[in-house]
């Protein structure tokens, strides 16, 4: 997420075919040069930086904070640990590092650990090169396959990461002393690539000790064997800066061996969060029904998350993920779609009444710290109101609301809610002409009934939250708006 999505992608297999070299001899003739993984990444990063190209696509909000630090770490050849709360695009950035690898890399054919044709380390590769020399066959590995990842869990073992004796190979008649009986773990299998460990504190401390050699001596030692395999990997890890679940910690010697420690953060600006939501959200669509989200409602969604991150009633140790904004955006659009389907409308625009749907998408993503039981719903409603009011004050000029207020003081009464169709709500412009200038400033040229209805409801709710109108709230999330100086009985 900042953010970019998710963060769960690889660069995608290229359509560029692999080079044609099939033996070590042909590889030498092609002029290919073997480089350590960190030098390879550094050179490709330098090329992009000099060409003024971004190192990572789709990551927003880090241009002046995280990215300069990461560029420094890459240029320095450091292993990196990212510290940050959930939903800060740590995994996405890590996975994006594959874009700095050469597109194709040669290995000894059949190698389990991506042996360098010029410097083989496994017994299989050494035997093959010793037997065939420069006629030894090679194969090509795409950069997407040079990335390995492990989500740290308490039950992760040394065998998972480093390797162990394969009992099946022993049962086939091989000796225990034979190196070919080894079953390599994830780290050796990512040799000459990038290996990532997510949620590093969840890895038990004795397993973390096993990573020390990789970071310092750059080799792995397999239990029961005297062999030491020199492994060439860029090791990257992610962790929460303060593990609020108290599941574990990073041991000091391991943390000390990471060359750079980079802190991530949530979007610093509302505009950045809006950009991320537009990039990541997948609003629903059904048949010929279209859902269009206006800019001011996008800002309400983003502002909700921004306010939650500064609220004393929200547990800040657990964080307020950018995924909250994405989920709220999608559920708001879904509620608008459901409303439109029930009313038989094909053009749907989310309204303020659709924000009530946040209850489902917010519940599992923020932790409310309320002294009284059952206060969670009220805290959520207060955040929604504060978000609408904040955006209303940003986008609506107070001078424009005075004429609208005068219409209500003359006795105007307006009903809104899920059961009010867009055409009916848009007709308010005829009854209260003073709404027209404000609505025009919000709809950005989209004068459809759905767009006008959404803008009208947003203006009325903003005026209510600004204490200029009274509102009798209905069960549908809408309500009846009237002047604060006129009682309900006076309008009957």
Name each model feature, range by range.
Residues 287-294, 307-383:
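C-terminal helical "lid" subdomain and adjoining coupling/linker elements of P-loop NTPases
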Residues 2-9:
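Short, positively charged and aromatic/hydrophobic N-terminal segments
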Residues 14-271, 282-299, 307, 312-317, ...:
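Conserved ASCE/P-loop NTPase catalytic core
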């Amino acid at each position: 997420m900042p953010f970019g999505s998710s963060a769960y992608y690889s660069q995608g297999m290229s359509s560029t075919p692999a080079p044609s070299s099939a033996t070590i001899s042909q590889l030498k003739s092609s002029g290919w040069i073997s480089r350590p993984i960190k030098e390879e990444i550094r050179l490709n990063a330098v090329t992009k930086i000099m060409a003024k190209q971004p190192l990572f696509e789709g990551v927003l909000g880090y241009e002046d904070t995280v990215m300069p630090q990461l560029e420094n770490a890459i240029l320095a050849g450091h292993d990196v640990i990212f510290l940050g709360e959930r939903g800060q695009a740590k995994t996405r950035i890590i996975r994006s590092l594959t874009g700095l690898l050469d597109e194709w890399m040669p290995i000894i054919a059949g190698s389990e650990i991506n042996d360098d044709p010029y410097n083989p380390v496994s017994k299989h590769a050494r035997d093959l090169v010793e037997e065939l020399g420069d006629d030894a066959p090679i194969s090509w590995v795409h950069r997407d396959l040079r990335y390995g990842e492990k989500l740290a869990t308490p039950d992760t073992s040394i065998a998972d990461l480093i390797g162990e004796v394969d009992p099946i190979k022993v049962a086939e008649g091989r000796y225990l002393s034979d190196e070919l009986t080894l079953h390599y773990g994830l780290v050796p299998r990512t040799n000459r690539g990038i290996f990532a460990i997510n949620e590093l504190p969840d890895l038990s401390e004795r397993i973390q000790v096993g990573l020390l050699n990789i970071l310092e001596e750059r080799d792995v030692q397999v239990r029961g064997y005297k062999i030491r395999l020199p492994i060439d990997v860029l090791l990257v890890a992610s962790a929460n800066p303060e593990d609020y679940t108290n599941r574990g910690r990073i041991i000091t010697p391991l943390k000390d061996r990471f060359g750079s420690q980079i802190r991530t953060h949530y979007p610093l600006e509302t505009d950045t969060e809006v950009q991320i939501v537009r990039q990541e959200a997948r609003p629903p669509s059904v048949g010929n029904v279209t859902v269009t989200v206006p800019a001011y409602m996008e800002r309400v969604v983003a502002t909700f998350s921004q306010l939650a991150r500064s609220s004393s009633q929200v547990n800040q140790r657990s964080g307020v993920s950018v995924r909250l904004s994405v989920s709220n955006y999608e559920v708001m659009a879904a509620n608008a779609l459901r409303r439109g389907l029930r009313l038989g409308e094909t053009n749907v625009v989310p309204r303020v009444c659709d924000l009530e749907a946040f209850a489902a998408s917010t519940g599992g993503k923020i932790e409310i710290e309320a002294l009284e039981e059952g206060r969670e719903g009220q805290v959520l409603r207060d955040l929604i109101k504060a978000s609408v009011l904040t955006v209303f004050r940003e986008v609506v000029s107070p001078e424009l609301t005075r004429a609208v207020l005068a219409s209500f003081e003359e006795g105007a009464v307006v009903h809104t809610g899920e059961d009010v169709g867009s055409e009916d709500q848009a007709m308010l412009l005829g009854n209260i002409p003073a709404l027209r200038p404000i609505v025009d400033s919000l709809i950005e040229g989209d004068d459809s009934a759905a767009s006008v209805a959404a803008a009208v409801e947003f203006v009325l709710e903003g005026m209510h939250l600004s204490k200029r109108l009274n509102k009798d709230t209905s069960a549908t999330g809408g309500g009846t708006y009237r002047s604060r100086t006129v009682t309900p009985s006076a309008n009957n």
